[in-house]
Amino acid sequence: MRRSKNDEITDDFGKKVKKYISQIKEVRPEGPYLFLGESAGGKYVYEIARQLAESGDEIPVLALLDSYHYSNSKNNTMVKMPRVNYLLGLIEKHITIFISSDKRGRIDYLKYYQSEFFFRINWLFKVFWRRIKSKLDKKYGEELEKIRKEKSLLRNKYKLAGYPGKVILFKATKGQYANVLANGWDGLKLGELKVHPLNCYHGGVLFEPAVSWVGATLNDYVVEFINNEKTKTKK
């Protein structure tokens, strides 16, 4: 069967997953394995866990920290929004994240975005330079657009299969996907989907008090698994 260019691009996601599984096996050859993936990383840990479970490994915890399962992660409402309104929305979001965090969370927030600020400045400079170079060099611009489209395919075109185990989703209840109860994961055939709401924006899941609450909840799942294993041993 002849493979299309899109198939080759899509396979890159699968190759990355295989590489991660190989690295995991080098460190820990056998399960049980506990997984937590944040945002876009959730798609990777889901597929890693699914393939490991398929090969017979035990996955007692597969948790997704406000990860999405959509054909496109961008919200059309936000994309079509006027630029000024979009920027004002971002400012409002970050102010809300800062205010709703506790003291420790605010300190962590400032530390994170202090380093993020310099990263973003460097990134914006590179984007600005690429745009200038694209206008001066048509061939370069065409190649850049080709790479952009290929990366988009990598992110959005890999088809995830169902998973027979339990998926734990920590769902941010503020922001553009607030009304989407399961972030699209209910569109897959899962053994069980457990959704825990977090009273924060997507960007707030990495700061206190959300972090402690997520940690405590995950600990409950781990303790439950350990107790079940002890019960099996006694039998």
What annotation goes with each model-predicted range?
Residues M1-K235:
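A hydrolase-biased, glycine/serine/histidine/acidic-enriched motif that marks catalytic-domain neighborhoods
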